[in-house]
Design a protein with these regions (language model features):
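Active-site and adjacent substrate-binding regions of carbohydrate-active enzymes
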Residues: 2-30, 37, 46, 50, ...
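Conserved aromatic beta-strand anchor motif in extracellular beta-sandwich/beta-rich domains
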Residues: 63-67
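Short, surface-exposed loop motifs enriched in S/T, G, D/E and P with embedded aromatic residues
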Residues: 69-84, 92
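Exposed aromatic-hydrophobic patches
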Residues: 87-96, 642-646
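Exposed beta-strand face motif in extracellular beta-rich ectodomains
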Residues: 99-103
Length: 658
């Protein structure tokens, strides 16, 4: 057997360099390749390390960094390999002279050189966050050394559980009528009471009006379930009074909706979470309010009022800019200092108040962050993001609690992640979309986020490029601290997208093992279905869950979710490690999460595929690989340093390498 095999015979190169992924030099932002003491601050030194497998005949490695707007270069020194390592380390030191320092590596080889598997080696190539490229490239995919204040350390280990409050759990505090529909003392005009087992509408006006009566005390009742999944952070969609059940059209930010139990219920929930060592992430719309919001009503009533400057009126009082021309969602004008004092800036703002007692939220998810502060020639998005980050920092100084700032973003967010504003995003573009494109039911007619087409079915080779390409444009901390979600309250359900239990298990394995914060939308763990974002907001069938009723609950998905998220908690590499791609085929993806304490290999298969033979040739002492988890129809066999990964159907295997 040769030293390195990379899949079935005749597999074409899967990288622009022409070098098989497993034989390529490697660097990433993880702790095995970037070393420094504590949080990196301006002026600190970082040790940068490049791993070159024994299969790759390198001649020299040099650093190219951009410091103070000018290029800095240095030759990397080879350091002795540790016993059992099958490759070479090259190292240098880089000073964080600027808040963000971009860098890459020039990798030279002798003309005509080949790898151990016989692949031609480029004599001249750049190693960037996008991989090995045998020509000159722009700086957009350079690695980045970031010296801004980091995200809270707890985010590295977090698993988020997303709850749409009205559909999660209804406590005994909510009165119901004889037909089981909620019957509060004061029912808003918009609300259409629904029995818990009635199916939500797929689309249409009714979607925002169906009121099931879930409340915050109901969430407290179900914390055991959330904790059993391995989740430690609860993300609530908006809790403020509004003109709809989704509450993204708030009528005030000063109190919690009485339909959910009011301020006292949110304080009770926060306290219950903190008693368990769990955390609370709240949801805020900074781009718009509802048309019934007290600020907007004051603005319409008096064009000379302070509140009139909070909005973008075109013809007062009824002509105004709104989110995507939805009249019920008037857009905020964040050029207004008075608005920012009330909404985003300082301890008295909406952002600041809910971080303090009695709520003590552990962070904010900002709705429509990509449009916040942007309209025509106005763009104050970065100012607002930095300002909110500053409000979180002030709260930390007051309370001692570190808080997380996450931005909703549906496409390429790299331009908004400089490192000093949002800690990360909801990673639809760099995680959800490519995973859907790979795992979607080939016959699916679903679309999402307004795309005027049905979902394509792409090969793993293309999907790996997408995952790597989007990731390459983000600073590593932003990538690690972004939310990875397979579905959310704004999309069809995972199960409806992929079509089968078997492919959903592969999706859960990807969620638990790729870099980023796993975020599970309540109901996905039981195989819930939904054809649109509105239809996906299905009430949780708690009686069926308790009875393990297989007609309503996919117990295999539930068990796999618990096992895989539990494994993530056990393996530090899956939480904090770097990412090294080893192989991509049409129906399989293979990568290693690298960490000084351990390396963990993950193989995902969407369908049956010929055996893939891999010698990872990773750094660290060679040890006997240990299979940590298997789901579906995947097998792994060990023959010395070579792994044989095969699949007769969809599945995944997780292997500890060292």
């Amino acid at each position: 057997m040769t030293d390195l095999l990379v899949g079935p015979p005749g597999l074409p190169p899967v990288d622009d360099s022409g070098v098989p992924l497993a034989e390529q030099p490697h660097h990433d932002g993880g702790p095995r390749h970037v070393r420094h003491e504590g949080a990196l601050r301006l002026g600190d030194h970082a040790v940068l390390r490049v791993w070159v497998p024994a299969a790759y005949p390198v001649r020299a490695v040099a650093l190219r960094a951009m410091v103070d707007g000018e290029i800095l270069t240095a030759t990397l020194e080879e350091e002795p390999a540790s016993p059992g390592e099958r490759g070479r380390w090259f190292t240098t030191t880089l000073v964080a002279a600027n808040p963000v320092v971009g860098y890459r590596f020039c990798v030279l080889a002798d003309p005509g050189a080949v790898t151990a598997s016989g692949a031609p080696v480029p004599a001249y190539a750049w190693l960037t966050a996008a991989g090995l490229v045998p020509w000159d490239v722009a700086d957009a995919t350079d690695f980045r050394l970031v010296a801004h204040d980091p995200a809270p350390e707890w985010v590295d280990d977090a698993v988020v559980y997303q709850v749409f409050p009205d559909r999660f759990s209804r406590s005994a505090r909510v009165p119901v009528d004889a037909e089981g529909r909620p019957a509060p003392a004061e029912l808003p005009d918009w609300a259409v009471p629904m029995a818990w087992d009635e199916e939500p509408a797929v689309r249409g006006d009714l979607t925002g009006r169906q009121y099931y009566g879930g409340d915050l005390d109901g969430v407290i009742d179900r914390l055991d379930h959330i904790a059993s999944l391995g989740a430690d952070t609860l993300y609530l969609t908006p809790v403020f009074p509004a003109g709809s059940v989704h509450r993204y059209d708030a009528s005030t930010f000063d109190r919690v909706d009485p339909l959910l139990g009011g301020d006292e219920a949110l304080a009770r929930l926060s306290a219950a979470l903190h008693e368990r060592g769990m955390r609370l992430l709240l949801d805020l719309t900074t781009n718009h309010t509802g048309a019934t919001h007290e600020w907007f009503r004051a603005a319409q009533a008096d064009p000379a009022s302070e509140e009139a400057g909070f909005y973008l009126f075109t013809d007062h009082p009824d002509g105004y800019v709104s989110w995507l021309d939805v009249a019920s969602l008037p857009k905020l004008d964040l050029r207004s200092d008075a608005l920012r004092d009330r909404l985003t800036r300082g301890p008295g703002s909406v952002v600041g108040r809910y971080l303090d007692s009695p709520i003590e939220a552990d962070g904010w998810r900002i709705d429509v962050a990509n449009m916040t502060g942007r309209h025509r020639d106005v763009d104050v998005t970065h100012e607002v993001a930095r300002e909110i980050r500053g409000t979180l920092r002030e709260a930390q100084e007051r309370t001692g609690r570190e808080t997380w700032l996450i931005a909703e973003h549906g496409h390429d967010a790299s331009g908004d992640l400089a490192g000093d504003g949002w800690h990360g995003t909801m990673n639809y573009a760099g995680f959800t979309r490519p995973l859907w494109a790979w795992l979607a039911d080939p016959g699916s007619s679903l679309n999402w986020l307004g795309l005027p087409m049905t979902l394509p079915s792409l090969p793993g080779t293309a999907v790996r490029r997408t995952l790597a390409g989007y990731g390459a444009h983000l600073p590593w901390p932003s990538r690690l601290h972004s939310q990875n979600q397979l579905s959310s309250h704004d999309t069809p359900r995972t199960r409806s997208v992929v079509g089968t239990r078997e492919r959903q298990l592969v999706a859960v394995a990807a969620l638990a093992t790729l870099p980023g914060v796993p975020t599970l939308f309540a109901g996905d763990e039981i195989g819930a279905e939904g054809l649109t974002g509105e239809h996906s907001r299905t009430p949780m069938p708690w009686d069926a869950i308790a009875a393990e009723d297989v007609t309503a609950v996919d117990t295999a998905v539930l068990a796999a979710t618990r096992a895989l998220l539990g494994l993530r908690r056990e393996e530090v590499a899956l939480r904090r490690g770097g990412l090294r791609w080893l192989h991509a085929g049409a129906d399989s993806l293979t990568f290693v999460r690298t960490h000084p304490d351990s390396d963990v290999l993950v193989h995902l298969a969407r369908d049956a595929h010929p055996p893939v033979l891999l010698d990872p040739q990773g750094p660290g002492p060679a040890g006997a690989p240990a299979v940590r988890a298997v789901v579906g129809a995947v097998t792994a066999e060990v023959d010395g340093p070579v792994l044989r990964l095969a699949a007769t159907g969809p599945g995944a295997v997780v292997i500890a390498l060292s």
